[in-house]
Every structure is written in structure tokens, then in C-alpha cells.
Amino acid sequence: MAAGLWALLLPLAAAVYEDQVGKFDWRQQYVGKLKFASLEAAQGSKKLLVGTEKNVVAALNSRSGEILWRHADKATPEGAIDAMLIHGQDAITVSSAGRILRSWETNIGGLNWETSLDTGSFQTASLVGLQDAVKYVAVLKKAAISLHYLSNGHQKWVEHLPESENTQYQMLYSRGAGVIHVLGVVPQSHLKVLTLSVEDGEVIEQTKVAAPWLKSLNGACGVVGEAVLVCADTATHSLYVCSLETEQEMKQIPLQSLDLEFADGFQPRVLATQPSVINASRTQFFLQLSPGHFSLLQCKQGLLSHLRDFQQAALVSFATTGEKTVAAVLTCRNELKPASSDGLHGNALEDSQKQEALTCSNQTYNINLYLVETGQRLLDTTITFNLEQNGAKPEQLYIQVFLKKDDSVGYRALVQTEDHMLMFLQQPGKVVWSREESLAEVVSLEMVDLPLTGAQAELEGEFGKKADGLLGMFLKRLSSQLILLQAWTAHLWKMFYDARKPRSQIKNEINIDNLARDEFNLQKMMVMVTASGKLFGIESSSGTILWKQYLRNVRPGASLKLMVQRTTAHFPHPPQCTLLVKDKETKMSFLYVFNPIFGKRSQVAPPVLKRPVLQTLLLPIMDQDYAKVLLLIDDEYKVTAFPATKNVLRQLEEMAHSIFFYLVDAEQGKLSGFRLKKDLTTEESWQVAIPTEVQRIVTVKGKRSSEHVHSQGRVMGDRSVLYKSLNPNLLAVVTESTDTHHERTFVGIYLIDGVTGRIIHSSVQKKAKGPVHIVHSENWVVYQYWNTKARRNEFTVLELYEGTEQYNATAFSSLDRPLLPQVLQQSYIFPSAISAMEATITERGITSRHLLIGLPSGAILSLPKALLDPRRPEIPTEQSREENLIPYSPDVQIHAERFINYNQTVSQIRGIYTSPSGLESTCLVVAYGLDIYQTRVYPSKQFDVLKDDYDYVLISSVLFGLVFATMITKRLAQVKLLNRAWR
């Protein structure tokens, strides 16, 4: 029977293709910036449980940093993780603004249970225990508190909180005594303490404590010891202490009595710890007096005592193992100094005030452990580690403590820096692993060609220069060939040397010193800019990070635009990239110029931008060093050129009449066109107003400047040519209705000439809404939207044609276009939502175009543009068959064989970047979101290179056989002719 079953299943088996094992593609998975983390308190533990700002719950391998399991929620505020609690093998999360409560099994990441919570503003959540067991989880909302069973999530009871309109309930506290304390505050009036029974939720006691100085409990207050509330007040420079169970008034303790003082303008924080929810909190707590000043205090029997002062501390943390609780303090190895006002923020402070951050001059840090009972430092517990110079400083600290065999304390530390890098450290300072989690939020990406090798550059140097005479050129060619021979010999020796080793021991390490362009230009440098302000140089064929650079003066939410001013084609001039950083709050901008191959800052000094930048233009004009000219237009419509040499200014003056640009003001609903004057001032040439009370501008999409169009028209069935309308200045403007009612919503699209402001075409999709994804290329526009009437996703494609006669075949000018192009339009039904969309691009534009569509499932669909052709006929004719037009069908099917990433899904995909390679058949693709995925696609198959499975042995054998047969046949023919001649 087993043999029969095996024979039955055998035909269903399928082999994995070679490109599915990472030969031409790779994927890197991330979790994002940490929001919550829990490290198992055992020496042999292997898991780190994390909840991140990217709405991810995951477990990391503490020995390698690899992701053991991961669950990513929606990439919207609805999927945000509000709280994360750990108990044994269960991880409890509250998400979706307090609407969903989940329990995860931490070993394999399985979902134990999920329950929906009542609506209401989420405040906090806490585990609740009885005697010696944790049985419940409590969730506090603005107006109610609910208790749920830890085993199945079922609600035990819910209690509405009194006076919730005026009282801000913000804290929960329970210590296994059968009651839950709910703490609320009426700002600048009093503190309210509710004591509820765990069994039925009945309010046992209500207490009001006068606190006219108290505005909020979050951060400024903490519960220590046997339910004692400790709060800090900057106005009176005091600490206030109140027992939640026995006292009804706050006891004031001036800081002067402890020889302490708050920093001016700093909001202090109280950091308490409760190792177990069935026991009381520790009586010891940290009081943060300034960004770099912490004090370890103890509150015992109503008395405050000062245990130890840490005046140069960057981060602190508590950790418990068994009966021992320790405090970890991260300090600079040398003296800390105040940082300049560069937009950096302190250690996860939630206050809105801008504080002085502390930075370490040599980027060398120490972590030490201290006994919380005495403040005494534990010997042999120092971890020393280094961060990159001019890099980010530590932002969060998590400690994993365990007891060694000799009952001494050992620990590991997880440090997260401002640039979202995770480092896992062990004594005495070994970096076990690190993760660059800022790559989970890539905002800008460019691919740059790698430089030539020395031999290739030597050969290139023979061309384009004045002749050195016949002998000189011969000697130069001879030396170049000798260099190539030497490189080839070294390559053969390496192949022979590696062939003698096991495959697992062969190292093909890629480093920044041996980077060189390959034969088909498939290997490139990927320059990625992340939201944290960190730049990466990644080798495209393997995903190896070759360099990274952190910009300290980039604020969160800043707009980042990356431009390539000079490529590697202009040897010996180094390539040059420019990053425009625009602050979200101040609107001020600055330029950062760097070498994309090595990541080093360029010696070229960019201009100082004194006004907010509205628009940038990368012109085809070059300076004497072959750097493209970048024009920056500020809010006063003044133009700044970079570089601004005399040669550049002269070229700008000559070409000013042909330089146009546009500005978009979405708030006012205006599109304005400007032209450049010879004196580098601007003049408004056109304006299009879109009424903001009816619709709003959501997207303005132009064409890629690097795009090449090979075919100027399409040959129709009657052998005539339908010429494309290839307007490089065409803008596609997408609008959405401001009315959100599903019967009145609409999506509009306007095709506007960016030089003249002429509206080429406009159309409206009624009963439709966004989000709208659009691709604008060649003579076509494809955009996707949601049809509210039919409740489905739809594509609409527009194609522009001049007709059967071309108006001006030599040069295009927007100023000389008397006739509007013909616009063909057709819509299609798509069975899935879309996360991102982009078109393939090749070096010459000969290859067929495909649309790369990122789906919410993480798959990337390669859809031939021929399926979205507005000329597809409903009833096929002889001419349409001659053109190979597919008959029109409104449904666009998703076939699994069109997924370019097979099972390598990209979570929370946000964008797709395409780049041409040296092969016309090949397009390089990078999809980024929570993960990064790189691959190659062949829209028209590989027609210009032999496939990897090409049988060289067979074809060589056939050729040798034919040559041998030819020689024998020739000899036999000669003998035959000779014999015939003798007859």
C-alpha cells in the first residue's frame, strides 16, 4: 500500500528551480524599531520577544539575531501595538487602539486566542495575579476597565469608571492581594484612586488625594514597594509619596534633603520595577533628573533614602533573575558632553520639550550592574562596546540577567541606537550580533553603476585621448594586455585553489576594495536612505552592506530626496550623489553630498539653503567635472544652482529659455508653471486651479528622465503606423473628492503639459476612491482605484497617440503642438488590492514593458502591459489578429507563475524600484517595505544571453563531430576525385 501511495504522489512532486535558491535574488527580513522587548531570564535562553513600531510581534534568536517567527499587522495606525505583556510561554498584545487583545505562543509564534474589546481610548494594560498564580490580564480604557482570563481571553467582568469625563485614568497596579488599584488624575486638582475587587470588579474603595500640582501620571509617577505612589514635581522641586491603601494625602519630600536638583526645563521621570505581578514592586526606583543624570532611591516605610547617584548615565534599566534584582547603567567611558542643537532627541523621553541630549565624544560606552538594595557595583560585570564615530547614540537598553553555576550574576545586553540599530552584547564587550532595523523603513533608493577595474580603466584610457604616436599607443596597449593577463591568471589560480576545498569553506566575500563592474552590469551599488537618517551602500547581487553613514541632524518625519549627479562613467572623477533633507516642522533644508561607492562625504561644499526648498531640478547640463547641475527653487521662487561655477552659470544663461518647472500646492489646489530667466530669476507662465472644496490633489506623476523609448509607433493590421504621443513634459495629476460619501466619491485624472499648462486630457471615475497607485511611462498612464459601487479594485489605462502622421519627427516642443493627441481609455477589474506599482525599464527600451504590482500578501506580480491595452477589441477582427491584440476581457487574472518572488514575500511592501542593466533583456528590481527583496526580471525572456542550463558539452561535442566529419569527408572526396581522374 505504501508503495502504491508513493507511486500516486510521485507525479505530483515538483523540483525547485535553480533561481529559487538565491542565485539571482535575495531577501532580508526586518522587524523595525523596537517599542517593547522582553529577554528571557535564563542562561541558555534563545529567544528575544519584541514588539515594534512597524506593528510587528516577533521572536529573535538571541545567539544569531535571526528571526524565529514574526507576525506583521497592518502597516497603518490601526495595526499599532499599544501594549505587550509576557508571562511564561505567553505573550499578550493589545493593538488597534485597544480594540484587539491577543495571546501568542512564544515558542512557535502560534496564536493562542484573540478577542475584541469595547471601543474606548486605550490607556494601559497589566497582568493580574492571585496569591501564587497569574490568571488575568486587565485592560484600562478611558471610561472602563475590563478583566480577561489569561487562558482563553474571555471577559470576566467590565466596570465603568466613575467621573471619567473629568478624570484621566492612566495607571493600573496589582500585587496579588485580590484587588486592582486604578489611578486617575484631574489635572491640577486631585488624584483619584479606585480599588476594585478582582473577583467581580466591584469598587471597594474610592479615594481622592489633593494634588494641585499634578498634571499627568505617565512618566512623572511610579508605584514602588507596598502600593506606594511616588511622583516628581518640578515646580516645587520635590517628590510626593502616598500609600494607595492607607493614606489620603501626599507627603512632600524636598529634593534638597536628598542633595538632588532637577535640571531646568526638564520633565523628570520615575522608573520603578515590579518583577512579579503577584508580589509588591521593589522599593528601589530610578529618578531621572536630567537627560544624563539618574539617581537610585529607596522608599521604605514612608522614608526616602538616596542609594547612589549616576551623573553621567545615558540609559538605565532593571532586571531580575530568581530573587536578585539588579540595575544596569549605561555610561560613556569618558566624560559626556552636551550635544549641539542638531535635532537629536534623548532617551525615549515622551515629553514634548526639546532637551539637551548627551553624546559621547569617542563613542565608547560601558554597561555596569549594581545591586538595587545597596547601589553597590557588582565586580566583573562591565561590558564595553564601541559605536561608529559620528554615529548614533544609544536610545534603549534591555538586560537579560541569569545566575551562573557559582551563583554570581551574568548578563547580556540589547542596545538600540537612535538610527534603529540593534546590538546584542555579552561580557566583556563582544558583539554577538547586530541588526540594521532602519532598513525596515526605506524612503529613497537609487542604483549606481560600479566603477571599472584598473585593467578596464586602463583600456578605457586609450580612447578619447590624443594619440601618443604609433609606438606609444602600441606600448600602452601591450601593458594593458599584460595587466589583463595577470588578472586572468590570478582568477584561474583562485578557481583551482577553491576547487580543492569543500563547497562550504569557499568564501566569496564582497568588500568595498574588490568592487568592480561585471560584464553585463548586473551588479550595482544600491544606495538606500532610511527614515531615521541613515544611508546605506548595499551590493545588489548579495545584499551585503558595504558602508553606512548616519546623519545626526535629520529629524523624524523629514523629507529625503536622493539624486545622482555624477555616475562612475566619468573616470577619474568619483561618482557623486546629493541628498536633499527637508525638515517637516521648520521646512528648512540642507544638502548632503557624498560618494555612493565608498559612502564618504564629498569635498565639494554644497550651498547653504537659507529658505525652504519647494522644488528640485536635475538638469542635463554638466560642469567641467561632469556633474549634472541641480537647481533648487525656494519659497520666494529664487533659484540656487549646484554646482555654481562660471561655466555652469554661462550654460544656464544660454539655456534659460528652455528650462521650465512646476510647483504643486495641494492645500490651495494650485499647480503653477514657471520658466527660468537669464538672470536666474523665475517668471510664472501658467496656473491651473482645482477647487479644494470639491476635490484635492493626491499625486502628481511625471516620467522618468532616464527612460528610453525605442519604438516611435505601433504597426497596425493594415500596415499603417499609429505614432505615439511622446511628451516628456507631461504630468499626470490625480485628484480625489473631498466628499467621503460612497455615492458621491470620485477619482479624477488630469494630463497637463508641464511647460504650457495645457490640459491634454481629463477624466473622472465616479463612485471611486483611493488610495490611487499610478504608473506614467512612454505614452501611457495606468492607475488603480477602488470602485465603491461594485466594491472592487479596478485599473484604468490611458494611451496617447498622435495619429497616423507624426507632426514633428525631428524635435519635440510643447510650444509647438497645435493638435491634441488621441486618447484611448479602457478599464479592467483586478481581484486584489495593491500596495505598490512600478513599470520595468531596460537600457534601450526594446524589451516589452511589464507592470510590477506589489500585493498586500507580499507577492510581487509581473503583469504584461499588453494585458492593459486600451486597443484590445471586444470582437476580434482580422486586423486585430494581425496586430496580435488580445480580445478584451474585463477581468485581469492573477496567475501564481507570474509572481517574481515565488515564496519570498515582502511584508508591508511600500515601494518597487526598477533599474536597467547592461543586458537589454534584463531589468533589476528592488521591492522594499518591512523587508527588502532584490531580483532580476526578463519581460521578453533572455534573448541576448545564453541560459544557465545551456548544454556546453553537447554543443561542443556536436561541433567537434561536425568538424571531424567534415575533414574525413573532404579527404574521402579528394580520393574519389583522384580515382575518377585516373579512369
Swiss-Prot record:
Disulfide-bond pairs as recorded: 221-231, 332-360
Glycans attached where? 279, 362, 808, 903
- Gene Ontology CC terms: EMC complex; endoplasmic reticulum membrane; membrane
Q: Which Pfam families match?
A: Beta-prop_EMC1_N (PF25293), EMC1_C (PF07774)
Question: What InterPro entries does the record tag this protein with?
Answer: EMC1 (IPR026895), EMC1_C (IPR011678), Quinoprotein_ADH-like_sf (IPR011047), WD40/YVTN_repeat-like_dom_sf (IPR015943)
Give the top-rank taxon of the lineage listed in the UniProt record for this protein. Eukaryota
Could you say which protein family the record assigns here?
A: Belongs to the EMC1 family.
Quaternary structure annotation from Swiss-Prot or TrEMBL: Component of the ER membrane protein complex (EMC).
Q: What is this protein called?
A: ER membrane protein complex subunit 1
* Taxonomic path: Eukaryota, Metazoa, Chordata, Craniata, Vertebrata
